[in-house]
């Protein structure tokens, strides 16, 4: 449908759209929750075969660490898709981790830009590695580490399935 819409407006260079609304399988209008606009942007970018998707935020979370704890932290200049996804799942809140997949699958770089510091140039997320050993530090509160050890009476796949069954029962990840 997007290609049909664009074909009707060939002379238009810029399209503005919302990012939080969608339709579900029942054709009902739904709200995508926080970060849904990031996902919409990369899905639209993939559909259009964009050269790059820019995500703007007013958050200063594009730093190497939390500015509430470290004075004047440096900006993260470049991350691979895998690094960005791991940081997001571990508490780095500069963007929605679900926006990575459409960009990664279509090899479309994502540029995170901070509206509070537009001159900084932002953070480029792509398939490329920068060679730096440490990119950023992030943390989440109330995380628990659980170590499982099998007594070998169950086959490994049965053991693991019982663990995940327990997580599912309590809606935990």
Show which residues each predicted segment covers.
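C-terminal catalytic "cap/lid" subdomain
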Residues: 1-173
